């Protein structure tokens, strides 16, 4: 389970980072931004369904420190 959770967290963070990158580049189309936002929301939705929001936020804080 730990490996699956790690994969989910890393995937979600990657999708989030990509969303931020796309949003910071004005040449990207609104459609591309929305498509990336949907990918992030899908990944984060799995975290929500598994009631892992607290664990994910702690993991993000640890990665950022």
Where in this protein do the model-derived segments appear?
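Short, charge-rich amphipathic interface segments used for partner binding and complex assembly
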Residues: 24, 29-65
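N-terminal acidic leader/helix
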Residues: 1-34
């Amino acid at each position: 389970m730990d490996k699956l959770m790690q994969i989910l967290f890393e995937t979600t963070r990657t999708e989030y980072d990509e969303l931020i990158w796309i949003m910071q580049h004005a040449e990207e189309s609104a459609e591309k931004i929305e498509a990336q936002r949907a990918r992030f929301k899908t990944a984060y939705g799995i975290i929500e369904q598994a009631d892992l929001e607290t664990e994910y936020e702690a993991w993000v804080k640890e990665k950022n420190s």
